């Protein structure tokens, strides 16, 4: 047993210090980034936000909607091959170029990903997604995928420490997904006692990844656009969002009508609801590590996306970053004990 004495920080523990700026307007900020990758020879241009590969969020409809904003969608791994075949047959090149295909680490996943990628050359991204990226089996599977898909852009996770980021990049990952337990419907930290404050995980993992010409995705913990700015400020190359995209028309959550209001169910992928939906039961060796929540139905995702992008542009303006790429260099975090004035938080419109 050992104790690390240095303080680890989450998004709620800091604010970004404003700095002098030559920018006159938010409209001058460019959120588009261009990435090249360690293994894949492909390049990517776009806004580096990703809809999470949860079954209610990472849907085909979400991919169609977000592609219009040049934003990626990590499509969940529970669609059948026939559903993929139908989606690819009716989708444009622009949509498919913004799709990340998610898989697990079983032999069935390996056969399925080969079949899916045989359908279209426009698919570029693979996300090998497990809750715990620290297993030797996971690393071995990553090497297998890289060997079979030498030129695809591969992201793998989740992990939260620099040494494992380095291990995954050296094993074939272009991008490493960072985050254990920060999600809005994740209870892993409570159930297991395992985790890492997200901002510190980003800072440490980005340092490790960038030293090897890799990138990271910050996965989880963002509740407002200011948190997204903090993630980019801490060194994240991409930011993955689940809860912030929940409750929209493009999601697959069950809609509940209560009097005159609509709500949508949103749950974690290790929750009782998810396990029963895809395996029929909770395996005897497992415990639920997610929760189910009922959130107000929010309509089309377009409005939420514009609000997020507007907040991100404003963050860049406050620190004088004309490009999103410059935000990390322009960021100075200050530790705080409060984030907002809460006097009217209990008042409703």
UniProtKB/Swiss-Prot annotation:
Alphabetical GO biological process terms: purine nucleotide metabolic process
PROSITE patterns: IMP_DH_GMP_RED
Known catalytic reactions: IMP + NH4(+) + NADP(+) = GMP + NADPH + 2 H(+)
Active site: 186 (thioimidate intermediate)
InterPro entries: Aldolase_TIM, GMP_reductase, GMPR, IMP_DH/GMP_Rdtase_CS, IMP_DH_GMPRt
Family stated for the protein in its record: Belongs to the IMPDH/GMPR family. GuaC type 1 subfamily.
Name the UniProt record assigns to this protein: GMP reductase
Gene field: guaC
